[in-house]
Amino acid sequence: MLIWIGHVSYFMWRCFFIIHNTRVPHKVKVLLTIYLKKLNKQLPDLLNGFYLYGSISLGAFVEGSSDVDFMAVIQRDLSEADIAILKQIHKEIQSSYPQMSLDGIYITKEDITGLDTEAKTCIYFNDGEIQGTKELQKNSIDVFQFYNYGVCILGKEPSQYNFSIEWNLLMSRMQDNLNSYWVNWKKRGERFLSVQYFDLLFSVKSIEWGVLGVSRLYYSFNEQGITSKVGAGEYAINNVPERWHKIINEAMRLRLGNPKSYYKSIFARRNDALAYMEYIINESNKLRFVE
């Protein structure tokens, strides 16, 4: 009983820490406090560490647009019963906070410690639902962000995990991502009457995703670091020809939720987005990273 009381006291102290952490936006603090209380009540002693990365860790969280990206380090492998409870918790959080998707992974403390020598498999959640398992590698953008920028909510600081991340290998994999995912994404948008074709006309999310997505890679290839979507847009404004400034400003406008568009025609906006992506892909491929 004394152990249980001690654990709850420590847990409540961590909730107090969340409330007073200036790196965490207020509404995210509310969401996390509810989530962690649910988790502590239904799966006590599961968490070994809990961290935020992504836009929050970069100081670029946009309410109504940004996800809440997390990495949960857990004490043990998850049973089917554990997974069922996590599914319900994430479903409830998503229902209560539909504008802030709590997206992240659950990895055991043994696996995250061993991540420096080999890739590990972990389960992950997105938009309130379990998405199955994914392979986590130390030379990935997720681990790089966690290690270098992560916000510690529970457990030791991310830098204490002592990963030896190989930047050139990470850059090489990001370039592979550019020439597979992003090239194919752009091609689908160019295909007449495809779903992506219509998304680029009517879905503001697609314009933002495409334009700022490749801009982030362009920033990383040139500056050997990472930045937020808006940060990448601002960087591009200062480093690409004026021809592209209009579509970049439009993408940042959509990201920030500003109402006034830079375009009168959704067709012109779509065409500029695809042309800009083509330009950035070509410019990025002029750089080479050797593993």
What are the language-model segments listed below?
Residues Q160-E291:
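Nucleotidyltransferase catalytic cores
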Residues C15-Y51, A81-I83, V290-E291:
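Helical scaffold of the NTase/Pol beta-like nucleotidyltransferase catalytic core
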Residues L36, N40, K87-Q94:
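Short, well-ordered alpha-helical packing segments
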Residues K27, L31, I85, A268, ...:
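Soluble or luminal CAZymes and related metallo-dependent hydrolases
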Residues H20-N21, K91-V204, V211, L217:
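Conserved NTP/Mg2+-binding pocket subregion across the NTase superfamily
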Residues G54, G59-Q88, E92, Q99-T108:
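Catalytic metal-binding acidic patch
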